[in-house]
Structures are given as C-alpha cells and as structure tokens.
C-alpha cells in the first residue's frame, strides 16, 4: 500500500526546504532516481540510463544537518526518531520516499536514501523494450561455468566467478575457522562502483567500496534501541543496495 504524501504547514515547509536545500539540484532533476548519503560531506546520485552512480562532494551536508533533516521529516510524517528509535521510513511532501538510519544502528553517521516518486504508464511491450531485463545475463550459462570450475578444482576461479555473477554466497564454519577472513577477501572482488550495505551485530566486515554503508543491530541494552537484523534488512532494501552482506544469520532473516 502506498501512503499518502504528508502535507506540511508553512513553518514546517520552511525548515524542511532549508534542510533539503543541499539536495535541491538532484531533487529537481527528472532523470535522478536515487539520492544517497552514507556519511557526512558526500552525496551519491543515480540517474536513469547510467550504469554507475555519481559521487559529489557536499561540505554543507554535515551530521547536524542530517540529524535536523531526520527530525523534520519525522515530524511532518507524525513519527519520532531518536537513539531509541533510529529507523525512519517516510515520504516527502512531493511524494519521494525516504529511508533514514541513525546511530546507534549505523557505524556512527546518519544514513539517508531518497527514492524519487517516478511512475511510468506504459504497455507491456514498451516495458520489455525499455527495461534492463536483457542485461541480467544467462543464469544457466553462469551455473555451467561455475560447475566447470568446481570440477576442475579451481576454487579461486570459482569464488571470483561467483562474486562477478552476483551469486548468493553462504559462508558456514566453526568458531575461529576463518569465516570473516574469507568474507572480507570476497568483498575485495566486488567492483568499486557497486553499492554495498552490510548488516552486523558487531562491525567486523571491512567495507572497501567507496559507496558502502555499514548498519549495526542493537540489542537494546543501557537504554539504546532494540533494532534487529531483520529490521535492518527491511530498511536496507529501501536504500538501493547492489550487494547486501549479513554478518550472521540466526533466525527469521
């Protein structure tokens, strides 16, 4: 179900527009679909038809502005956001969808994702003519190639090919068996232009990608938030990941 865009009062609009001003250039562009912030002072933008996201320096986008923006968006959506409630899923007055994650559910910085509301009315034929489905590749060929590498016992080639083909990889082993070491080695094979989001209880994953965001599950001790891995998985899917890395799987996630 799509929620109705909130209607902000004049005073609320003044504050909201002020905090959104650093993003105004991209909010106004028809070809921009995603506006992302992983940490202060930088903005990532995705445009229609572009294979890679753009990185822009944004010195005015500091921690204070991001926190104020989060509180203002929460206010106009009749929500609250704080260290005890650090996840915010909301809508801007123009219809753009917003997901924000605040500490302690991040590695220290406020994270922001704005997905602009863009709904095209087209026929099924037009959809397949214009869609990116043909670029997905032949999964049967991928499976055959991976099977051949295993048959040849080329395990290095197998893992490199599996990462390149964006296969789902599950690493399992006993305590101190090198699971995290292997995971960090696999992450180095991910192309730098891809967006990586990690979810962990304790930050151990080394995020080498330029466009990377680390989210942290919180157990709720000492008055902090109760944010589960499952909560963060749902939030991360609204933050445009190319790759989603989960440190430990224990239950419903």
Model features per residue range: what roles?
Residues 1-94:
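N-terminal accessory targeting/assembly segments
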Residues 34-36, 44, 89-91, 97-101, ...:
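Structured core elements
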Residues 41-42, 61, 104-107, 118-120, ...:
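Conserved nucleotide-binding/hydrolysis micro-motifs of P-loop NTPases
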Residues 54-64, 75-164:
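P-loop NTP-binding catalytic core
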Residues 148, 152, 156, 160-161, ...:
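Switch/coupling sub-region of P-loop NTPases
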Residues 176:
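Walker A (P-loop) phosphate-binding loop of P-loop NTPases
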Residues 179:
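Conserved lysine of the Walker
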